[in-house]
Curated annotation (Swiss-Prot):
The lineage of its organism: Eukaryota, Metazoa, Ecdysozoa, Arthropoda, Hexapoda. The modification Phosphothreonine is found at T774. Residues 720-778 are annotated as: Disordered. Keywords: Actin-binding, Cell adhesion, Cell junction, Cell membrane, Cytoplasm, Cytoskeleton, Membrane, Phosphoprotein, Repeat. The keyword ATP-binding does not apply. One of its GO terms (biological process) is cell adhesion. GO terms for molecular function: actin filament binding; alpha-catenin binding; beta-catenin binding; structural molecule activity. This is Vinculin. Residues 258-470 are annotated as: 2 X repeats.
Amino acid sequence: MPVFHTKTIESILDPVAQQVSRLVILHEEAEDGNAMPDLSRPVQVVSAAVANLVKVGRDTINSSDDKILRQDMPSALHRVEGASQLLEEASDMLRSDPYSGPARKKLIEGSRGILQGTSSLLLCFDESEVRKIIQECKRVLDYLAVAEVINTMEQLVQFLKDLSPCLSKVHREVGAREKELTHQVHSEILVRCLEQVKTLAPILICSMKVYIHIVEQQGRGAEEAAENRNYLAARMSDELQEIIRVLQLTTYDEDTSELDNLTVLKKLSNAISNKMEQANEWLSNPYALRGGVGEKALRQVIDNATEISERCLPQDSYPIRKLADEVTAMANTLCELRQEGKGQSPQAESLVRGIRDRMGELKSLVHQAVLGVDKAGVQQTAHTIQGRLEQAVKWLQHPEINDGGLGERAINLIVEEGRKVAEGCPGHQKAEIQQLCDEVERLKRQAAGSGPAAKQAAKQLTQKLYELKAAIQNALVNRIVQDFMDVSTPLKQFTEAVLQPEGTPGREQNFNQKSNNLQAFSDRASKTSRMVAAGGACGNKKIAEILLSSAAQVDSLTPQLISAGRIRMNYPGSKAADEHLQNLKQQYADTVLRMRTLCDQATDPADFIKTSEEHMQVYAKLCEDAIHARQPQKMVDNTSNIARLINRVLLVAKQEADNSEDPVFTERLNAAANRLERSLPAMVGDAKLVATNIADPAAAAAWKNSFQRLLGDVREVRDAIAPPQPPPLPTSLPPPIPELSALHLSNQNAERAPPRPPLPREGLAPVRPPPPETDDEDEGVFRTMPHANQPILIAARGLHQEVRQWSSKDNEIIAAAKRMAILMARLSELVLSDSRGSKRELIATAKKIAEASEDVTRLAKELARQCTDRRIRTNLLQVCERIPTIGTQLKILSTVKATMLGAQGSDEDREATEMLVGNAQNLMQSVKETVRAAEGASIKIRSDQTSNRLQWVRRQPWYQY
């Protein structure tokens, strides 16, 4: 079946598919009784092109040493040649009989063969090119595997000579490959991994120098240095393994995430396969000692298998875990025997055979477990609270639809996240979140069922879920303000402790204390980042993925940084030790800053500043307590915290100003930030005067005044970022109409006649109420829920549900997206149809969808050009740029499917349908994301573009007319 993971393949298949679609249309017209035209000329052109393609293919086979290519390509060449021959025969038959049925059958079979054979040839060649790149990656992995046995500078020099050209080649070839990929996500992963490999390589070499230096001196710290080296080599290996995994991918699901359970399982399974060879080599060597590369590979296989057992289906979990435990016990015994010099004993050899058999069985069980999760098709819960809330609300609004327990799982995860966040909150906030969690669980139990009470409980549950989400996000803003208030001091104090001269009193104790402080800060920061990834206000999948990745990196990097600090303490004169410490410090600082920036981006800046204000007031109260208690140091500490919060507010203000291209907004924000920056030294100066003369009431009064001015400047910054909104219109209902018995005329009006009604005027009809807004033409197909065996219609309905909340009047993006949803619903019918004209209409509908997708992309790009918010604009461009590629692929796949109509049921037909379904789902998801991004971008439009602004008007429900 056609795949389109590279731009080259897509550019070749698109014109071929266009020609085939014309032949399919001619075939349909002939079924209507029309004579087929003379096809000899176009068929001759196709035959010549096929002959040339076959010649190039055979030359490639003869010159290649790729066994898989030499095995797979001949069958693809044979298919293309056979298809070309069918076209020639059909052309000859039609020339003599333009109405020939057998000729038309050969024509459609030949068309199908040309398209699929060409695709197979291209894929065959492309896979061969990928294998070459993977071979280079594996060569680097082999070098990294021996990093642990490099013990002299001569060996290190040779290691570097061997590694450098391989690394350069990997960087060059993977860099060229990522530019060829059509799936943007795959390209981004390759770029990110390459950047990490490039950064880590010199740090690894430096760590190896440190290790060799310590070993040659027979000094202290060899274990820490070896651990540093192994950690860096393992990180580089992981990045290369991820490159290898992504290079082999040919499809992408827009709904998937790097955080999805199935994606994680596939990564773990891939890692097991890659480590198996090293593990078997270790088993085969009776002299291999404990702690070597091979044993570590074996242990990694067991760890990965155990993690898979925790993520797979229950029926697959126990056998994997049991087998992993058996291998662990046997490996421990084998290590002890080899350590005692009994590696060749009958017992050891028996253990080796047993471990090898079980490892093979474990690999097979892991493969089955991953397939089991894939086939089960259990829909993933979203990775953010916003996404989980949408899944839960969808279930609560339509409990009659079987969602496989997705909505209930989403609610459970929201509650679980709420309880996790509550643990780190102060008393009153903790109690509030825990109470909301309890109420959600209670209402969830009451909502089970279909009676009136259950429906009422479902409504209340929806409301409580929104309240819980808001409470979690408020708590997270609190954590971000507190935990990222000062990210530099723990690292700075740790560095100062490391650099203390030898012989300084309490040097070791000070180092231990500052190391513990650094570890505690890292733990807090990474925990907060994980919570923000799940519960942040932005709901951005990419930010969530990077936050989780950064948190894991900080967790693993902190112990290595502390070890590097200890080595530097032990060897103050070593240039290599100092350079290594600086390398890891830079890695750590960059990762923490990235975490802080992403947490800021995931938080509403106005909420952040408001929470910072509240914390400033708390610290100000503590300052007042310090003044009353005559504690100057407490005054200094709390003033420092206020200053840190002010600097964070200034940083957020600068980020918002740099992110905006609206001159009015940036001018107002920068002016407010400058005033705040000028106010800070005055407050700090007044606080110093108080600290030096804690009993002076005049100094205390001056400090209070300067703090209040500072607080006012903070509010001005907040107002500049998010101007205060006017009070909402009253939403209360009018007073109820009293009963007739309660009505009476007052004495004042008793004598007065009622007013006379106006005389009727001819020609004037009474004014009609405004008609309800109904841009629902052709939308009847979405009024009922599609069946589970209609995946394309389900995807189309999902897009329609997203866009129908907006009026398409004065909003071309919404109009185009609605048109796409309706066309996709029609495509869903045509895929299952085999009526006369269905092939022609299938191709025409796919073409219309592709044209509408180009309209959505064009309009989104126009909107992005007008958007003043750089982050929103980048996000909009990223999501909309995927659409044309998917639209082109839809045309090609629809042509393939059209050649299958009338021959349903074959494996090829099923595969074509599956690919078409996946493509349709990706297209609908991309358009849905584009609509959401476009709505956000419309809020931040240049002031000189207001006349062309898209109108985002929510459609009124019928009861508001």
